[in-house]
């Protein structure tokens, strides 16, 4: 948590070959220059090993943000809209052909391992806006993962309370920024679909997928509001950390009122995740049959289940604080049911049968810990494993307490699930404001371009990114005859 998105890549494109601007002649050239920087940064990010991509993420975000004002300026000129009170006259000379590599579409999956998925061609600047903004939103989500990563690392000492709150606040801000972008794109895509009947080229930028990603970002941001003051995951991680030097632990303490509030927040996150899952699951039944990958659908379902399990845990904490240990254990049974954990009927707890079952569980935990240490696709189960560890700790504590002191009857969990209240929202989604060029920059682009646009000279495929230069002493046009067969020969 959050979802480990993969950033797309794109082909080279020259704005000057498809657009001309009478009012600001240098606008197409500047847009091509900014887009070329974005293309190179995305290509460099993709080729960097996964464990080292974090260092290049701020560069990708900054290049995307720098490119957006020029892209929106060209888009405004095509639709005859003013920017800062200044008219921009952009003329379409020929339909653009831009290639993007989708990362969420199920048809992007390839049968050959190690081969990149196929690209899709877009013939409208509108979908260029969609891909660039969705890429920026995905990058914001990856920045949220980067901020939360130190909270789950076990190879160093646990972070303090203040550092934990700072990390959660930074991640929440990035997720809310991503949700605002997704909401803007979803509204714009719905207008294209209903008003002009335009079908998206892939599922990544379809109205349903964009709305689902907005709901996903809101669900993850809502869960972070709970994680900020939830002491139990930190206690479980601290107990598993071998580098922890604390010899005295403070028992987790949650006020009764806040436990009920946290439960309703988790239910709100579960509702967002359920909406996202429903939208993505319905894509395959829509016209065209475009659908998202199974891994993304599985993550949405796990997030919905984990959020409901968290709500059951907080309802159980609320009951335990009120002296109703039997009801608290019943809430744990309901949460285990939501997590899909098998229960032993004789003991009522999570099934801990020895042999291969326990060995497989330990192997899964070690594999997830290695993913966290290396910074790979950790949290791909939407926090299900982490929540099951908290459940195990609470089950041992409450069952021992009920067997020795309280001796209360554990009621069935079915009626408790039917009495769960509605979720409560905590975040307000702010509308996304498209960035605009400032007046001095617009005024400077009234001058004619000082150079030609060389974006078309670069190959369109990011696999063949090495240009064949002229060999010294060779005749013009015979560069390929002197080319070595080694791909990366220097």
UniProtKB/Swiss-Prot annotation:
Residues covered by the BRO1 domain: 1-299
GO cellular component: plasma membrane
Span list, region Disordered: 342-362, 445-470
SMART domains from the UniProt entry: BRO1
Cysteine pairings via disulfide bonds: none
An example Gene Ontology biological process: cellular response to pH
InterPro entries: BRO1_dom, BRO1_sf, pH-resp_palC
UniProt cross-references to Gene3D superfamilies, sorted A to Z: alix/aip1 like domains
Family: Belongs to the palC family.
Job description of the protein: Required for the proteolytic cleavage of the transcription factor pacc-1 in response to alkaline ambient pH.
Protein name (Swiss-Prot/TrEMBL): pH-response regulator protein palC
Species of provenance: Neurospora crassa (strain ATCC 24698 / 74-OR23-1A / CBS 708.71 / DSM 1257 / FGSC 987)
Record lineage: Eukaryota, Fungi, Dikarya, Ascomycota, Pezizomycotina
């Amino acid at each position: 948590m959050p979802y480990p998105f993969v950033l797309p890549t794109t082909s080279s494109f020259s704005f000057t070959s498809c657009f001309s601007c009478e009012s600001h002649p240098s606008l197409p050239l500047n847009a091509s220059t900014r887009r070329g920087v974005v293309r190179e940064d995305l290509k460099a990010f993709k080729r960097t090993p996964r464990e080292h991509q974090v260092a290049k993420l701020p560069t990708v975000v900054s290049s995307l943000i720098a490119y957006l004002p020029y892209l929106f300026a060209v888009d405004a000129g095509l639709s005859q809209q003013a920017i800062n009170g200044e008219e921009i006259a952009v003329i379409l000379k020929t339909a653009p052909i831009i290639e993007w590599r989708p990362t969420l579409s199920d048809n992007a999956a390839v049968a050959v391992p190690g081969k990149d998925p196929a690209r899709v061609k877009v013939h409208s600047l509108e979908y260029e806006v969609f891909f660039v903004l969705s890429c920026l939103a995905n990058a914001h989500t990856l920045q949220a993962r980067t901020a939360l990563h130190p909270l789950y690392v076990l190879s160093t000492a646990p972070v303090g309370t203040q550092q934990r709150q700072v990390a959660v606040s930074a991640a929440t801000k990035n997720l809310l920024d991503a949700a605002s972008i997704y909401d803007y794109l979803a509204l714009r895509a719905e207008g294209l679909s209903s008003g002009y009947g335009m079908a998206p080229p892939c599922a990544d930028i379809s109205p349903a997928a964009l709305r689902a990603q907005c709901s996903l970002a809101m669900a993850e941001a809502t869960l972070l509001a709970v994680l900020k003051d939830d002491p139990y995951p930190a206690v479980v991680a601290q107990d598993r950390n071998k580098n922890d030097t604390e010899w005295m632990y403070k028992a987790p303490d949650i006020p009764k009122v806040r436990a009920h509030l946290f439960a309703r927040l988790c239910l709100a996150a579960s509702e967002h995740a359920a909406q996202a899952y429903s939208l993505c699951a319905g894509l395959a039944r829509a016209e065209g049959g475009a659908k998202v990958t199974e891994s993304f659908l599985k993550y949405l379902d796990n997030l919905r289940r984990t959020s409901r399990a968290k709500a059951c845990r907080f309802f159980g904490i609320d009951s335990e604080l009120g002296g109703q240990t039997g009801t608290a254990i019943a809430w744990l049974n309901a949460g285990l049911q939501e997590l899909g954990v098998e229960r032993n009927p004789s003991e009522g707890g999570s099934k801990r049968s020895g042999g291969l079952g326990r060995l497989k569980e330990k192997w899964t935990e070690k594999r997830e810990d290695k993913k966290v240490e290396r910074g790979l696709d950790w949290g791909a189960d939407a926090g299900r494993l982490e929540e099951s560890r908290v459940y195990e700790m609470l089950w041992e504590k409450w069952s021992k307490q009920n067997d020795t002191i309280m001796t209360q009857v554990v009621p069935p969990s079915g009626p408790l699930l039917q009495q769960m209240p509605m979720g409560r929202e905590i975040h307000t989604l702010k509308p996304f404001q498209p960035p605009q060029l400032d007046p001095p920059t617009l005024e400077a682009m009234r001058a004619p371009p000082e150079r030609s646009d060389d974006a078309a000279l670069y190959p369109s495929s990011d696999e063949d990114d090495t240009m064949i230069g002229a060999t010294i002493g060779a005749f013009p046009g015979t560069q390929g005859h002197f080319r070595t067969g080694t791909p990366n020969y220097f």
